[in-house]
């Protein structure tokens, strides 16, 4: 029965010595051969191998197999023996021997073991790589044999960047790559190729997990920051921050702040340009000198811009009246005030000092009704003067009045003509104006055209009335009638025209009758007298004669 000989009991040097001792000079004169099959086999690490040793020597003794590997005699017979080698983990040489006619015959075979790498790993890439700068790809390979057939390939996508043999254990292969924009988001990996095709086994490939590279471009120039120089408390103003030449702009981070107050920015990018917009609102506790800050961060690098800003408080001006609606003759006080450090001027009269109010007093009169009082305020902020204005209007209550200049007291108009009674009343509250004829309730319209006749002749009481009292003005209307002989003359003319018309009509009728009568011609006469047969002959009228 075959015995299992652990390889740990026989160091490699001892087995080499044993093989050398077995190769005695008598071997060269041997007439018979000892065959070992298979010859020079190749198998994967950890596999098993069936080995057959045979000889044609007719008087051979027991065949032995010498190896550092675990072995087991499977079967044997005259001139042959079969062994099973298990857990073959490394390259080895096996030796079969037998005694034939007192001489030792040997045969050998070399076992080649191939092993895929246990670890193929691409070293981590930089979190961000500047475009235009070199970076190193580093691949580490542990185990794998035979090394003469093992190659390490560095890849970008499927593009080969470097191909090198794996030499050391562990093997480390590197390649230098110039970063470009096209490399942003590209996967890099490491691949090992164990080429066992010459042994008829094929090409064994093992690939590492890919690592993604992020490249960036960040210009050295700071962002352009557009912000106000001054900002009033409780007011808002837009702030813009722009940076050009940024890649990839979509992955940049923007920080906008007013002092220690972070602003809610809206970030937009177009190509390689990034723009952040926010609204800055000043608080009361921020009054004074502050800074607007814009930070753009990409690839672990930062570009920053700062602008000075002054937060100020500008209260007023506030204009007050002691009586917004005053009675005529009363005293009214007008005052104007504003915040600290503000200089106010009321109707051209400045206050004593900044922060102090300005005042004036007046006795309210009719002319003050509707009067406006103006107050201007000036505040100096960081060398600049800011101005604001405010006003207030005074209302004065006074009794009704009629303007004599626009309401003539004596009017001369002609009968049957159109005229307008131009009278105007004033007062606060605005009065009602009516013009009534004395002795009657007849009212004439005021400010409206009307047809004048002789009945409007007389004296009128024009009265303006309101809750403040009444005011009356006497207006006399003198209506001139037409000439007194006009009617008789007109009647006479009509009668004359009538008589003339009748006479002409009678003459026309008489002449027509004469033309229609009978006439007799007298022969003895050399002329033809015409004798009318009309009844006029019977009346004895004689023809007129010229004297």
Curated annotation (Swiss-Prot):
Name the record gives this protein: Intercellular adhesion molecule 3
Membrane-spanning segments: 486-510
SMART domains: IG
Extracellular topological segments: 30-485
Signal peptide (from-to): 1-29
GO CC, one annotated term: extracellular exosome
Protein's UniProt keywords contain Cell cycle: no
Tissue and organ expression note: Leukocytes.
UniProt keywords, alphabetically: Cell adhesion, Disulfide bond, Glycoprotein, Immunoglobulin domain, Membrane, Phagocytosis, Phosphoprotein, Repeat, Signal, Transmembrane, Transmembrane helix
Domain Ig-like C2-type intervals: 46-103, 132-197, 234-301, 329-382, 416-469
Principal localisation: membrane
Cytoplasmic side: 511-547
Disulfide bonds: 53-96, 57-100, 139-190, 241-294, 336-375, 423-462
């Amino acid at each position: 029965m075959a015995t299992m000989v652990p390889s740990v009991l026989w160091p490699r040097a001892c087995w080499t010595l044993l093989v050398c001792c077995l190769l005695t000079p008598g071997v060269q004169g041997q007439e018979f051969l000892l065959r070992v099959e298979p010859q020079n086999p190749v198998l994967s690490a950890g596999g098993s191998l069936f080995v057959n040793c045979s000889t044609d020597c007719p008087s051979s003794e027991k065949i032995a197999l010498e190896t550092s590997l675990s072995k087991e005699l499977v079967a044997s017979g005259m001139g042959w023996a079969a062994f099973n080698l298990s857990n073959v983990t490394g390259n080895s040489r096996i030796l079969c021997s037998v005694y034939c006619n007192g001489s030792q015959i040997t045969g050998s075979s070399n076992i080649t073991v191939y092993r895929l790498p246990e670890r193929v790993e691409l070293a981590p890439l930089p979190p961000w790589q500047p475009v235009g700068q070199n970076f190193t790809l580093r691949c580490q390979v542990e185990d794998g044999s035979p090394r003469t057939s093992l190659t390490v390939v560095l890849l970008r996508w499927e593009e080969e960047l470097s191909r090198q043999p794996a030499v050391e254990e562990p093997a480390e292969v590197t390649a230098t790559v110039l970063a470009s924009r096209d490399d942003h988001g590209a996967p890099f990996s490491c691949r090992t190729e164990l080429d066992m095709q010459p042994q008829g086994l094929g090409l064994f490939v093992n690939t590492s997990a890919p690592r993604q590279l992020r490249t960036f471009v960040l210009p050295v120039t700071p962002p352009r920051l557009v912000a106000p120089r001054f900002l009033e408390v409780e007011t808002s103003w837009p702030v813009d921050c722009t940076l050009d030449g940024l890649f990839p702009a979509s992955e940049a981070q923007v920080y906008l702040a007013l002092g220690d107050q972070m602003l809610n920015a809206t970030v937009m990018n177009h190509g390689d340009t990034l723009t952040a917009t926010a609204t800055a609102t000043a608080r009361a506790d921020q009054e004074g000198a502050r800074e607007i800050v814009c930070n753009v961060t990409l690839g672990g690098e930062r570009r920053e811009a700062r602008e000075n800003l002054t937060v100020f408080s500008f209260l007023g001006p506030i204009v007050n009246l002691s009586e917004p609606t005053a009675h005529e003759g009363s005293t009214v006080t007008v005052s104007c005030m504003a915040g600290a450090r503000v200089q106010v001027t009321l109707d051209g009269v400045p206050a004593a000092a900044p922060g102090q109010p300005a005042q004036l007093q007046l006795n309210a009169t009719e002319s003050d009704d509707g009067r406006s009082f103006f107050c201007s305020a000036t505040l100096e902020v960081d060398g600049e003067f800011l101005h604001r204005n405010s006003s207030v209007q005074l209302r004065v209550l006074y009794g009704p009045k009629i303007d004599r200049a626009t309401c003539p007291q004596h009017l001369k108009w002609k009968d049957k003509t159109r005229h307008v009674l131009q009278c105007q009343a004033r007062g606060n509250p605005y009065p009602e104006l009516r013009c009534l004829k004395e002795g009657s309730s007849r009212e004439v319209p005021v400010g409206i055209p009307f047809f004048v006749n002789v009945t409007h002749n007389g004296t009128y009481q024009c009265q303006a009335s309101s809750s403040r009292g009444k005011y009356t003005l006497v207006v006399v209307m003198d209506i001139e009638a037409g000439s007194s002989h006009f009617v008789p003359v007109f009647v006479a003319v009509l009668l004359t025209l009538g008589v003339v018309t009748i006479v002409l009509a009678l003459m026309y009728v008489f002449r027509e009758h004469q033309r229609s009568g009978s006439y007799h011609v007298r022969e003895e006469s050399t002329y033809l007298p015409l004798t009318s047969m009309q009844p006029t002959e019977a009346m004895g009228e004689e023809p007129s004669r010229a004297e």
